[in-house]
Amino acid sequence: MLNIVNVSLPSRCRIICISDLHTHWQETKKLLEHCNYKPDEDYLFILGDILERGDDNINALRYVMKLAENKRVIVISGNNDMFVHDFAVGYNQEKFCGYFNKKPNRCFMEMAESIGITDFSEQADEKRKLVYETFKTEISFIMNLPDAIETQQHIFIHAGIEGINWHNMTTKTAKNLHRFINLNHESDKTVICGHFPCYNAGRQNSNLPIFDFERRIIDIDGGAGVTLASQVNALIIDKNDDEYNYQVKYSPIGEAKTVISDYSESRTWYYADRKQAFSLLSPDKDTPTGFIKVRNNETNAEGVVPECMSGYWDGDWHVWANLNSFPSVKKGESIWVYAEYGEYCWCITESGEVGSVPKRVIDLM
């Protein structure tokens, strides 16, 4: 059975909801400032995955712990948040060594390194206990987080719900349910979740929250630390009696650049999933240098994609960027750059779109 916090909201209030910051606490702090967050008036719900996928775990955790001292702030746990406890005290020695050698846990290792431990090949149990004792307050905070928040009209959860009696589902499902945005649920309430990056859902060419009112689902995962171009999203809910209005703010990861001239290219973008198989086509006059032209073997959609965002395995080509992603920008707008290839950059634009923008229209200095 899930550990659920029930909140009876007043007739008028504002809820700010964020999720999947994945150690990016500074962007989260900027985002809350952008939302004009008022700790004495607003509710703040953080839907898990505070940790991992980044390199500032300890500071991120302590930042969230400080926020949570306010009774109007509720933090729930995500699947990535559980790893630090498992590595500290959950796994037996054999499992610890197996996982650790395969993929060292970033948060646990960050904690260990902060007290001078860099190797667990000897005296692993003693060292793990020392890490746990040193960070017992932080690890206990994570382990005591609830699984969900329920209000009059909404369910807030990390990954999603399952079944009419969703209160009784396992915590593992609550934290790991895959692609919930594409599923149906039996509750009459709107479910607000993270866990699955919005860019990967194929609904839009951006990381912005997805509103599926037919399914009563809102996904707010901006892909921070997961997708190449990523951000932390905030869903702002203004409650006025029985009316709920939604607003979105976001904070891209990284430093903003400036667009120095207008750019627009009319191409239709097509969703691409790295698990799908693609065929490599011959380039034509509309294939920019540094790009390849491909066809999706499932949908037959054709388009171009940066060659650096493609790979060949299992006898097929695969890509991990949407086809024909060339968002429009205007002079003076902000833009965030994540990769450079040929004459283009992979960016998040001020409108939130993700894609290739020519270097010549960006002040990269």
What do these predicted ranges mean?
Residues M1-R62:
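N-terminal active-site segment of His-dependent metallophosphoesterases
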